[in-house]
Design a protein with these regions (language model features):
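Mobile, glycine- and charge-enriched loop segments
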Residues: 1-18
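Alpha-helical hydrophobic/aromatic positions enriched in membrane-embedded helices and signal peptides
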Residues: 2, 33, 91, 143, ...
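Active-site metal-binding loops of divalent metal-dependent hydrolases
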Residues: 9-12, 40-44, 100-102, 152-154, ...
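Core catalytic region of metal-dependent phosphoesterases/phosphodiesterases
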Residues: 13-127
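A structural signal for short, well-ordered beta-strand segments and their strand-loop junctions
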Residues: 35-39, 90-98, 135, 149-151, ...
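Active-site-proximal segments of metal-dependent phosphoesterases and phosphodiesterases across multiple
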Residues: 61-66, 108-168
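Conserved beta-sheet core of the metallophosphoesterase superfamily
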Residues: 146-197
Length: 197
């Protein structure tokens, strides 16, 4: 049985490419996928990032919370656009693969366990949206048929070769913000790694 899927990496809401997201939404409505896979880094999550706070004074929690809430609101607004298109075509199978930017949320909650609402699954309403959640780069990846999906782990010059070499099976990933492919043929058949950007 052939099923159609749309896979999107690294949207980084709210600093996303607005035209690209409109095209993704239109593609969903034209293709009518059976499966949608979000490969993570859906949000930029600026105020959760240690990069943002490096060299800056820590803000008191009452000043920080509004910034965090704005990040959550902005990223959910972006996901809402995609979900609206998925709802129009009745796409029921939805997967969310956590990216390294979403890991920042979970690390924040480890530091402040009383702010559980900022965990990735909670902040993005993963269950309510109908997504199956896949934590960041676990050994057991999302696998559909013979194809594995992960956010991405390696960023070297030949990252698609590295992903294929390490995982040893066909794999699709994002993380690198560029396109790359590597294919290997052996006695067991052909396997490939695709970086979607």
């Amino acid at each position: 049985v052939v099923r159609r899927a749309i896979v999107t990496p690294d949207k980084h809401f709210p600093i996303h490419d607005k035209k690209a997201i409109k095209i993704v939404c239109k593609a969903i409505e034209i293709v009518k996928p059976d499966i949608y896979i979000d490969l993570g880094d859906t949000g930029e999550w600026e105020h959760f990032s240690s990069h943002y706070w490096k060299g800056r004074s820590a803000k008191p929690m009452e000043d920080l919370i509004p910034l965090l809430n704005k990040d959550v609101k902005d990223v959910n607004k972006g996901m809402d656009m995609i979900d609206e298109s998925l709802d129009k075509v009745n796409c029921k199978e939805r997967h969310f693969v956590q990216g390294n930017h979403e890991v920042w949320l979970d690390k924040f909650v480890i530091r402040y366990p009383y702010l559980e609402q900022y965990k990735t699954e909670n902040a993005l309403k993963i269950e309510k949206r109908g997504y199956e959640y896949h934590p960041y780069n676990r050994k057991k990846l999302l696998k559909i048929g013979k194809l594995n999906f992960t956010h991405g782990k390696f960023v070297s010059k030949y990252h698609s070769f590295k992903h294929l070499d390490v995982y040893g099976e066909s794999i699709m990933y994002g993380h690198t913000h560029d396109l790359q492919r590597h294919t290997k043929t052996h006695a067991g058949g052909t396997i490939s790694a695709w970086s979607l950007g």
